[in-house]
């Protein structure tokens, strides 16, 4: 009997070790405990909540995305200065006013400002205001051997200045603000990035949707900026969608080829807003 129990326990342990990788990850960002990281090392008044990637227990599930989390800098505080030789980053300011430290520059930033941060350039965030500044930090791995087209200067814009427009394939009830694309982009406000292919805001009419779909070459993260609804993450062979309640502050990471989308939960009033970012999956290079 003792021998049989040992076998059962061993099989149970093996099943845990061999658990299938998740199709998506879900995080309630305000509920994430702050964690120490390079952005907060020896820094005064800064806290980082790791949602996905570095600092999160499921970091290995992300292949091309290095990190995604929320940085808060208190009044009079500052983050550490950081630099990554093989990672491009985007900051998106959720609330408050701060000072972006970028190389030798000190650039004031406000709510809804977003910016592209080149690999190898030291950067951080300071706060000289009377209220906290809160921002999303997004990092994307640069594969070895990738040729970068450097941006001539700091690229920064505000999403309030980007027009809403329809995007083919996503229906009439969602409009898009195309914030940032690659250096080859001709449609985005900023053409800046290498591996990050699209940063955008979706504006949903009450009861609207962007029509669930999938991406064969990219990972994606949705972050609910305002409102509530149902997040679509994954689906079955019968066409049924995996739908999960989502509200402001919720974030979802979606693997490539998984069904992704959003259904607005609003019936009237303010439109629901979702900030989304897609980046290339680092497929192995084919050698000649």
Task: Label the model's feature ranges.
Residues 97-99, 122, 132, 228-230, ...:
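Structural motif
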């Amino acid at each position: 009997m003792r021998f049989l129990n040992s076998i059962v326990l061993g099989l149970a342990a093996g099943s845990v070790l061999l658990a299938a990788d998740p199709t998506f990850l879900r995080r309630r960002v305000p509920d994430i405990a702050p964690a120490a990281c390079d952005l907060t090392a020896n820094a005064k008044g800064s806290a980082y909540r790791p949602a996905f990637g570095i600092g999160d227990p499921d970091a290995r599930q992300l292949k091309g995305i290095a990190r995604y989390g929320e940085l808060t800098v208190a009044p009079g505080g500052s983050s550490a200065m950081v630099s990554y030789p093989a990672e491009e980053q985007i900051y998106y300011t959720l609330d408050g006013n701060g000072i972006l430290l970028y190389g030798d520059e000190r650039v004031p930033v406000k709510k809804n400002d977003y910016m592209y941060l080149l690999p190898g350039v030291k950067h951080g965030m300071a706060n000289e205001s009377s209220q906290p500044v809160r921002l999303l930090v997004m990092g994307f791995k640069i594969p070895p051997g990738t040729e970068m087209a450097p941006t001539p200067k700091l690229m920064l814009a505000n999403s309030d200045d980007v027009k809403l427009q329809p995007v083919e394939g996503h229906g009439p009830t969602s409009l898009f603000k195309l914030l940032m694309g690659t250096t080859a982009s001709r449609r985005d406000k900023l053409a800046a990035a290498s591996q990050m292919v699209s940063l955008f805001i979706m504006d949903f009419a009450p009861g609207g949707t962007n029509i669930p779909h999938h991406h064969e070459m990219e990972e994606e993260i949705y972050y609910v900026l305002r409102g509530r609804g149902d997040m679509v993450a994954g689906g079955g062979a019968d066409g049924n969608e995996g739908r999960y309640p989502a509200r402001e502050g919720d974030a979802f990471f979606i693997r490539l080829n998984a069904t992704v989308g959003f259904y607005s939960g609003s019936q009237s009033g303010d439109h629901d807003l979702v900030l989304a970012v897609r980046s290339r999956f680092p497929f192995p290079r084919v050698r000649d």
